[in-house]
Regions:
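Nucleotidyltransferase catalytic core that binds NTPs
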Residues: 2-146
Length: 146
């Protein structure tokens, strides 16, 4: 299992797989892995040749008074879960890698759905989820996402 921390390294690894026509599966997470994540990883292993798991606590889906700093982070434990489950690549980017400091700001909103469920009392939560998922899917460019 390889642990990569930046987009360029991830793309190099994935290009090797794509040159061999291997099917890439992607399991995006915020870490704190549990049995639900492991079941997704196992399904990805059954379906795909290469499995990528991202571990990124997305600040864009936390409101200003929410507990971003308290969200559990234990890369060592999560990496062990991934290794035991047969993950090929763990992508662990820093915030600057996903949200570089630039003058360009991307915003994605889908009000029909982003105001439902916890979005009704957590303004911007699902906008943040949409944004990070768009970015991660464009970075990993998987054949299948779980």
């Amino acid at each position: 299992m390889k642990i990569v921390e930046n987009i360029d390294s991830l793309k190099k690894e994935l290009n090797i797989s794509r040159e061999k026509n291997l099917k890439v599966g992607f399991v995006p997470t915020m870490g704190a892995l549990h049995a639900g994540h492991i079941s997704l990883i196992k399904k990805a292993k059954q379906t795909c040749d290469v499995v990528v798991v991202s571990i990124f606590v997305n600040p864009a889906q936390f409101g200003p008074k929410e507990d971003l700093d308290q969200y559990p982070r234990n890369i060592e434990t999560d990496a062990k879960f991934c290794e035991d489950a047969g993950v090929d690549i763990v992508f662990v980017p820093q915030e600057q890698e996903i949200y570089p400091i630039t003058d360009d700001t991307l915003h994605i909103s889908y009000p029909k759905y982003t105001t439902r469920l916890c979005g009704s009392f957590r303004p911007g939560h699902f906008d943040g989820v949409l944004l990070v998922m768009t970015k991660l899917l464009n970075i990993v460019d998987p054949d299948v996402c779980f």
